[in-house]
C-alpha cells in the first residue's frame, strides 16, 4: 500500500445513465473500498459494469486532475494489505482516505474473500485461486473534496 500521489488520467464509470455530476452514494451495500463514486482507468471494464445494469448501458468519461492535498491510498496489486483493507471495508469498517485506488474483487474474487473470512479456505488458498484472474482496476472517490478532482468529459451509449 502506498499513500500519496496519483497522476492525471482519463477514467470511466459504467452505469445505466450518464453521470455528469457524480455523487457519493451511501447505501447498505459495502464495496471493496467503502462508500464512494467508483471509476476505472480500463474502458473495457467500465463497459462490463455498464452492461450489467438494467436499462441503457452508458460509459461516462472523466478527466482526473491530481490534488496533493488529498489523502490517497493506492494498491498497485493484490497484496496482504489489500486483502485486509477489502475485508474491513466489506465488513463496514470506515477509513479516512479521500481516494482509494487498486485492483477490484469482482464477484468471483469476492466469493473467495467471503470463503477466507468464514474460515473455509486458508489465506494461501485464497492467493492461489486469485493469481490467474485478469487485471482489474478501480478508483473510488470517497469525499466531496475528492469529487472536485474529476471533470465530466462526455458519455457513450453502448
Q: For each of these PLM feature ranges, what is it?
A:
Residues 2-7, 19, 31-32, 48, ...:
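Conserved NAD+-utilizing ADP-ribose enzyme module
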Amino acid at each position: 500500500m502506498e499513500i500519496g500521489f496519483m497522476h492525471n488520467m482519463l477514467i470511466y464509470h459504467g452505469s445505466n445513465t450518464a453521470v455528469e455530476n457524480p455523487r457519493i452514494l451511501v447505501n447498505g451495500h459495502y464495496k471493496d473500498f467503502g462508500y464512494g463514486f467508483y471509476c476505472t482507468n480500463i474502458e473495457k471494464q467500465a463497459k462490463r459494469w455498464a452492461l450489467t445494469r438494467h436499462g441503457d448501458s452508458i460509459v461516462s468519461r472523466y478527466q482526473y486532475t491530481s490534488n496533493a492535498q488529498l489523502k490517497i491510498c493506492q494498491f498497485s496489486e493484490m497484496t496482504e494489505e489489500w486483502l485486509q483493507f477489502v475485508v474491513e471495508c466489506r465488513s463496514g469498517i470506515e477509513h479516512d482516505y479521500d481516494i482509494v485506488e487498486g485492483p477490484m474483487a469482482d464477484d468471483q474474487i469476492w466469493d473467495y474473500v467471503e470463503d477466507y473470512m468464514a474460515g473455509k479456505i486458508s489465506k494461501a488458498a485464497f492467493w492461489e485461486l486469485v493469481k490467474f484472474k485478469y487485471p482489474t482496476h478501480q478508483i473510488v472517490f470517497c469525499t466531496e473534496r475528492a469529487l472536485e478532482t474529476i471533470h465530466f468529459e462526455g458519455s457513450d451509449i453502448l
